[in-house]
Amino acid sequence: MTTSPLANPTATRELLEEFGLATKHRLGQNFLIDNHVIERICELAELAGDERVLEVGPGCGTLTLALLQEAACVTSIEADPELEPVLDAHAADYANFRFIMGDALKVTPEQIEQAAGGEPTVFVANLPYNVAATIILQFFQTMPALKRAVVMVQREVADRIAATPGNKTYGGYTAKLGLYAQVTGRFEVPPRCFMPAPHVDSAVVRIDRVEGVAPEELDREFVARVIDAAFAQRRKTIRNSMSANGFAKDVLDAAFEDCGIAPTTRAETLDVAAFVRLAQELIHDA
C-alpha cells in the first residue's frame, strides 16, 4: 500500500505555510489530500521498480513522494517558480528525484531525457486541467519509450479521451490520441479529495500505448491532418468538411470509394482504423 505523508489537509497546509506559499489558481493548482486516491493511482500505474516516471505539475510533491517509493526515478516538470524551494527540499531527501522548472508543453524530450538519465517509460500526474489533453497527446507523440500514462484530469476530458465512435464526446482529439494509445482503466475522484476543492469533477485514466494502429511508413502527422479536416466542420458530411479544409473533391471521392466510406458519412462515426485507411489513400496525392 503506497501512501504519501502529504496526502492530508494538515500536512499540506503546514508545508505551504513553511515555505510561505498560497495556492495558485492561475496555474490550476488544487492539491491532492486523499491517500486512497494516491493508492489507486499507484495501483493503476503498476510500477515494478525499474521505471523512469515522468510527472507534470507536482505542486508540493504529494503524488511525487508516493511515486518515489515505487519507481527507479521520478522526473517532475513544474511551472510555478515559487514551488522550486519545496521541490529542492524533496530532492535533498530523495536521490531518485529530479525536476525541471518550466512549461511542460515547451520542455523538449531531450531536456527530459537528460534530467531523467534516459527516456521516460511511464507518465503519472495530477495534471493542470487547462492543458491536460494537449500534454497527454504531445507526450505520446514525442516520447516513443512512454509505455503508459496514469493521469488525473477533469471528468469531461476523461470522457473525451475514452470516447468511442458515435458518442457525442468523440472527436478529432480522441481519434488522434487513438493513433498512439487507448484507455485501459478509469476511476472517478470527487472534489473533496483536493484542497481547495475544485468546482469540477475529476477522473483518473490509464492510457496504454498501442502498436500497429498505422504502418510505420505512414506519416502520422498526415493522418492527424486528415482527422482534423474531417472534424473541422462537424455538422457537415466528411466530404464537405474535408473539401473545405485542403482536400480536392475528386481526390476525396476516389479515396472514399477505395476505402468503402460513404461521402455522406460524418466524421464522428469513423474509428481510427478508418482514418488510417483514408490517409493511406490520400497521401499519394498530398
What is each of the regions a protein language model found here?
Residues 1-228, 257, 268, 277-284:
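Catalytic cores of RNA-modifying enzymes
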Residues 209, 227-286:
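C-terminal lobe and adjacent flexible extensions of AdoMet/dcAdoMet transferase-like proteins
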